[in-house]
């Protein structure tokens, strides 16, 4: 199929390098209904309940019904169960050996998992960590640092990461209660051991690789509830999304997708793309996924308050329930849209070479892709190579090739997404320029 030149194509002449959020497309009333069902009072109540366990440190009490990590994980499990019979709820349990540092002795670690089966086995994750930690206090208003051998001091962890766990629990509730039969399988995970070095997530990813699970996307939420930063700046109008490079990696495609769906279903609440794996020098439970080749992103609040983090002051008073609710809705919009969409198309040949050429004229962008089961059509995206997000798009029919007249593949990046019969689009598959291998030149 050859696409006729239209006004959208002519916009390439005016590219100035600034990122533009794509204009919202048609809103699916089904997804809009699910997003709207996120409940702010319930969000606030979940944060408070998690903080009320006193501490959720990995080595804290496992026998009490009201205090420590044992009580917290059982409560989380019960919340998943209460969300409805469609969810398959379990503990993802590991016996972790003592290895010094943050793991001073043997410990049983339990991630809490709920699975909402879809029509296909491909998985989409939303995650947060439910464990907490706090520096020890000196009794005089100061702190003495971390003591990883002890777990008896308060660590309410309302924002870090009670907020992310709240995203997971509320997303599970509204998506399970929606009655929608999603194409993809949705997985909700509250990880443990994040504060000990991403332990629960690392073990879970290893299991996923061993089991051969296909995981298309991971949305990790860590510190997403505060709108008042430690530097005195407040910002309740945006959330940051961190994604692993390089520029057109699968992780970056997830970030762009979340931003696009947020503009559609949560207008006025910006998703800010941050082109790095995490905050400087930091990491999160998305990190092990990316390290194992599974595309993942991290969502975090716009303005952090470092004084509250890992302290007895990380209480519900530092969480803005209205702001956190909007961040839950951003997650739900992306999860529902992606789970209703087909798989992303394959844009390389059997040798891994991108199916993108200059066409017969030598000056057009000619692209091809493999057909996707369940796709009703495809959407082609392109942008100037220096710009972080898609600037132009055109929807094509049920075809497997297209030509963009006058579009130079030297100057733009091109991608294609599959569109389902209800209009939901997949992640975008990008035509990435192959790496040139260093050639060894022999001399005499």
Predicted region positions:
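N-terminal capping segment at the start of a domain
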Residues: 21-67, 307-312
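Active-site-adjacent mobile loop/cap segments within catalytic or ligand-binding domains
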Residues: 49-51, 224-240, 274-343
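Alpha-helical metal-binding/catalytic segments enriched in His/Glu/Asp
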Residues: 114, 126, 131-132, 137-197, ...
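Metal-dependent peptidase/peptidase-like ectodomains
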Residues: 191-288, 292-296
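Conserved aromatic anchor
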Residues: 363-374
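Beta-strand-rich modules
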Residues: 404-425
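Extracellular fibronectin type III
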Residues: 421-444
């Amino acid at each position: 199929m050859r696409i006729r030149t239209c006004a959208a194509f002519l916009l390439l002449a005016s590219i100035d390098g600034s990122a533009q959020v794509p204009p919202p497309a048609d809103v699916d009333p089904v997804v809009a209904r699910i997003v709207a069902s996120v409940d702010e009072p319930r969000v606030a109540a979940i944060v408070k309940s998690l903080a009320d366990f006193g501490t959720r440190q990995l080595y804290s009490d496992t026998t009490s019904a009201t205090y420590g990590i044992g009580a917290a994980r059982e409560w989380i499990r019960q919340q998943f169960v209460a969300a409805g019979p469609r969810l398959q709820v379990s503990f993802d349990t590991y016996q972790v050996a003592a290895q010094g540092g943050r793991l001073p002795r043997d410990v049983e670690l339990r991630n809490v998992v709920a699975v909402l089966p879809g029509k296909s086995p491909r998985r989409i994750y939303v995650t947060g960590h439910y464990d907490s930690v706090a520096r020890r206090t000196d009794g005089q208003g100061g702190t003495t640092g971390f003591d990883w051998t002890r777990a008896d001091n308060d660590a309410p962890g309302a924002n870090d990461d009670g907020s992310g766990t709240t995203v997971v629990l509320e997303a599970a509730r509204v998506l399970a209660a929606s009655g929608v039969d999603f194409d993809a399988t949705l997985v909700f995970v509250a990880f443990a051991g994040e504060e000990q070095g991403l332990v629960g997530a690392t073990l879970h990813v290893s299991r996923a690789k061993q089991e051969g699970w296909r995981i298309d996307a991971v949305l990790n939420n860590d510190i997403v509830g505060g709108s008042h930063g430690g530097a005195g700046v407040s910002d309740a109008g945006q959330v940051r999304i961190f994604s692993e490079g390089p520029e057109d990696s699968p992780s970056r495609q997830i970030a762009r997708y979340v931003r696009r769906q947020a503009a559609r279903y949560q207008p006025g609440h910006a998703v800010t793309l941050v082109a790095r794996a995490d905050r400087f020098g930091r990491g999160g439970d998305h990190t092990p996924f990316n390290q194992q080749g599974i595309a993942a992103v991290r969502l975090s609040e716009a303005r952090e308050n470092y004084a509250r983090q890992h302290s007895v002051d990380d209480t519900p008073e530092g969480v803005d329930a209205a702001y956190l609710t909007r961040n839950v809705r951003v997650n739900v919009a992306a999860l529902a849209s992606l789970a209703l969409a087909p798989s992303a198309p394959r844009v390389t040949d059997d040798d891994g070479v991108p199916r993108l050429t200059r066409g017969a004229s030598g000056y057009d962008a000619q692209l091809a892709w493999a057909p996707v089961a369940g796709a009703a059509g495809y959407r082609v995206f392109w942008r100037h190579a220096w710009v972080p997000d898609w600037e132009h798009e055109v929807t094509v029919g049920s075809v497997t090739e297209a030509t963009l007249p006058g579009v130079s593949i030297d100057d733009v990046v091109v991608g294609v997404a599959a569109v389902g019969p209800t209009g939901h689009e997949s992640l975008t598959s990008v035509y990435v320029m192959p790496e040139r291998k260093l050639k060894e030149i022999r001399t005499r």
